[in-house]
């Protein structure tokens, strides 16, 4: 069930109401940093698995 543009707009408006315009950029930055760290960690796991497969061959 994908999130469409209408749903994203509703989520953004609710977040703006709850957190206010001053706090929202800080929350966005924190979410982006967390997502970036997660992607880097999973990328590291994937490359470790690929190296292990190459060693096994």
Swiss-Prot record:
Q: How does it sit in the membrane?
A: Single-pass membrane protein
Query: Which chain regions cross the lipid bilayer?
Result: 1-21
Which ranges form a coiled coil?
none
Q: Which keywords are on file for this protein?
A: Cell membrane, Cytoplasm, Membrane, Protein transport, Translocation, Transmembrane, Transmembrane helix, Transport
Q: Which GO terms describe its cellular component?
A: cytosol; TAT protein transport complex
Superkingdom assignment: Bacteria
Q: Which Pfam families does the record associate with it?
A: TatA_B_E (PF02416)
GO MF, one example = protein transmembrane transporter activity
- List this protein's GO terms for biological process: protein transport by the Tat complex
Q: Which Gene3D superfamilies match?
A: 1.20.5.3310
What the entry lists under InterPro entries is as follows:
TatA/B/E (IPR003369), TatA/E (IPR006312)
What is its subcellular localisation?
Cell membrane; Cytoplasm, Cytosol
What does the record give as the function of this protein?
A: Part of the twin-arginine translocation (Tat) system that transports large folded proteins containing a characteristic twin-arginine motif in their signal peptide across membranes. TatA could form the protein-conducting channel of the Tat system. Required for YwbN secretion.
Classification via HAMAP family: TatA_E (MF_00236)
Something else the entry says is: B.subtilis possesses two minimal, substrate-specific, Tat translocases: TatAd-TatCd and TatAy-TatCy, each one composed of a TatA and a TatC protein. TatA is bifunctional and performs the function of both the TatA and TatB proteins of Gram-negative organisms.
List the NCBIfam families: PRK14861.1 (NF011430), tatAE (TIGR01411)
Family, as annotated: Belongs to the TatA/E family.
**What is annotated about its quaternary structure and interactions?**
Forms a complex with TatCy. Two types of complexes exist: one composed of TatAy and TatCy, and another composed only of TatAy. Cytosolic TatA forms large complexes or aggregates.
Q: What is this protein called?
A: Sec-independent protein translocase protein TatAy
Task: Give the organism the record lists.
Answer: Bacillus subtilis (strain 168)
Taxonomic classification, please?
Bacteria, Bacillati, Bacillota, Bacilli, Bacillales
